[in-house]
From Swiss-Prot:
Comp. bias intervals (Polar residues): 388-410
Phosphoserine: residues carrying this PTM: 43
The protein's name in its UniProt record: Ameloblastin
GO molecular function: growth factor activity; structural constituent of tooth enamel
Length: 421
C-alpha cells in the first residue's frame, strides 16, 4: 500500500507544479495594457505629454547604451528620466548654439587690433568689453569717437571701433537680463557655459521649434519588421494589429513565446500587417459597406449577385466599381451581356441593386463615370484587358462555388485583388 501511495502523491505534486508553472507562464509578469502587441503601449494622453517634452524630440535610438538597445523603451514608461532633466545629459548643441548665436559673444580681435593695444591704453574698454562695459557702450558711443581719429591712420582705426559698434547694439537686449556676469568673462571660455547656466537658472529655449513638433522616435531592438518608426502620429490605441507582436515578451523571456494572445491580452487583430486595408475617401462611405458591418445578409449587392449567378460579372463590377472607384473596373455600361437602361447605366440581373445604391461608391468618382453615353464603345483591346476573366483575380476559385456561404467574406475581400496589366 505505501508503495502505491507514494507514486500517486508524487503525481499529484507534479501535476500541481506543472499547473502552477503553466499559470505563471500564462499570466504575464508585467500587466499588459490593451494595445498593439509589439509596440510600447502608450495612451493618447501620455503621448501628448511626452511629445510636448523637448528632450524626446531627439533621435533616442542613439542612446548612451549603444544603438537600438532596449533601454529606450524604459524612457517611454518613465522608468528612466527623460533626456531634458539633467544639464549634463542635455545635448551639446544647446550650449554651443546659445553660446554662438542667441547670446552673441564678442568676436575675436581683428589682426589689426593687437597693434593698437599698447599704443592706446585709453581704448581698452573697446578691445576687451565685459558685460558691464558693453551695456554702457551705447551711452559712451558719442563721446570717444572724436579723439579716435586724431593722429592715427584712419584705416586701422575705422576697423576696430566699427566692429565693436556693430556688435554692441545687438548684444544689449540679451545681455541686459544678466547684469552681474563679470565672472563669466569670455577670457575663460571653458567656464563660460557653466557659469552662464548657474547664474541664469533655467535657460529659456530661444531655439526655433523643431521641424516636426509632434513626433518623437522610438527604437525597437529586434523589431524592424512591422513596427512604425514614429509614435507621434498614432498612439498604440489607434494602430492596426501587427503580426502577433514580435517583441512583446518573447524577446525578453523566451517562455512567453507561444501564449501571448491567450490571457490578459487582446485577441490578435484579424487585419494583419501583411494584408491590405481599404481606405475610403468620403466619410459617409467609411461608415457603410460590407466591411463595416452591413453584412452580406442585409441586401448588399455582393450577396445578391452571388446568390443569383455565382459567376456573373455583376459581382466583380459592383464590388470593383464601388471600392476601387472604377479605376480598375469596367466603366459603367461597358459590362458585356447586361441590358442597358435609357441612360446607359447597367441594369444588371433583377436581383442586383443598381450601381447608384452601392454603399461603397465614392460620390466624386461616381459622377466622373456617368459620362459614358449609351452608344459609345471601348476599343476591343481595352475591353479584353478590363473584363473580369479568371486571370484577373487569382482568388476567383472561391467565387465559383455556388452555395458556399462560408466563403462569402473571403469573396468580398479577395475579389478586389487585381493583377497588374
Amino acid at each position: 500500500m505505501p508503495a502505491l501511495k507514494i507514486p500517486l502523491f508524487k503525481m499529484k505534486d507534479m501535476v500541481l507544479i506543472l499547473c502552477l508553472l503553466k499559470m505563471s507562464s500564462a499570466v504575464p509578469a508585467f500587466p499588459r495594457q490593451p494595445g498593439t502587441p509589439g509596440v510600447a503601449s502608450l495612451s493618447l494622453e501620455t503621448m501628448r505629454q511626452l511629445g510636448s517634452l523637448q528632450g524626446l524630440n531627439m533621435l533616442s535610438q542613439y542612446s548612451r547604451f549603444g544603438f537600438g538597445k532596449s533601454f529606450n523603451s524604459l524612457w517611454m514608461h518613465g522608468l528612466l528620466p527623460p533626456h531634458s532633466s539633467f544639464q549634463w545629459m542635455r545635448p551639446r548643441e544647446h550650449e554651443t548654439q546659445q553660446y554662438e548665436y542667441s547670446l552673441p559673444v564678442h568676436p575675436p580681435p581683428l589682426p589689426s587690433q593687437p597693434s593698437l593695444q599698447p599704443q592706446q591704453p585709453g581704448q581698452k574698454p573697446f578691445l576687451q568689453p565685459t558685460v558691464v562695459t558693453s551695456i554702457q557702450n551705447p551711452v559712451q558711443k558719442g563721446v570717444p569717437q572724436p579723439p579716435i581719429y586724431q593722429g592715427h591712420p584712419p584705416l586701422q582705426q575705422v576697423e576696430g571701433p566699427m566692429v565693436q559698434q556693430q556688435v554692441a547694439p545687438s548684444e544689449k537686449p540679451p545681455e541686459a537680463e544678466l547684469p552681474g556676469l563679470d565672472f563669466a568673462d569670455p577670457q575663460d571660455p571653458s567656464m563660460f557655459p557653466i557659469a552662464r547656466l548657474i547664474s541664469q537658472g533655467p535657460v529659456p529655449q530661444d531655439k526655433p521649434s523643431p521641424l516636426y513638433p509632434g513626433m518623437f522616435y522610438m527604437s525597437y531592438g529586434a523589431n524592424q519588421l512591422n513596427s512604425p518608426a514614429r509614435l507621434g502620429i498614432l498612439s498604440s490605441e489607434e494602430m492596426a494589429g501587427g503580426r502577433g507582436g514580435p517583441l512583446a515578451y518573447g524577446a525578453m523571456f523566451p517562455g512567453f513565446g507561444g501564449m501571448r494572445p491567450n490571457l490578459g491580452g487582446m485577441p490578435p487583430n484579424s487585419a494583419k500587417g501583411g494584408d491590405f486595408t481599404l481606405e475610403f475617401d468620403s466619410p459617409a462611405a467609411g461608415t457603410k459597406g460590407p466591411e463595416k458591418g452591413e453584412g452580406g445578409a442585409e441586401g448588399s449587392p455582393v450577396a445578391e449577385a452571388n446568390t443569383a449567378d455565382p459567376e456573373s460579372p455583376a459581382l466583380f463590377s459592383e464590388v470593383a466599381s464601388g471600392v476601387l472607384g472604377g479605376l480598375l473596373a469596367n466603366p459603367k455600361g461597358k459590362i458585356p451581356n447586361l441590358a442597358r437602361g435609357p441612360a446607359g447605366r447597367s441594369r444588371g440581373p433583377p436581383g442586383v441593386t443598381p450601381a447608384d445604391a452601392d454603399p461603397l461608391m465614392t460620390p466624386g468618382l461616381a459622377d466622373a463615370y456617368e459620362t459614358y453615353g449609351a452608344d459609345e464603345t471601348t476599343t476591343l483591346g481595352l475591353q479584353e484587358e478590363m473584363t473580369m476573366d479568371s486571370t484577373a483575380t487569382p482568388y476567383s476559385e472561391h467565387t465559383s462555388m455556388p452555395g458556399n456561404k462560408a466563403q462569402q467574406p473571403q469573396i468580398k475581400r479577395d475579389a478586389w485583388r487585381f493583377q497588374e496589366p
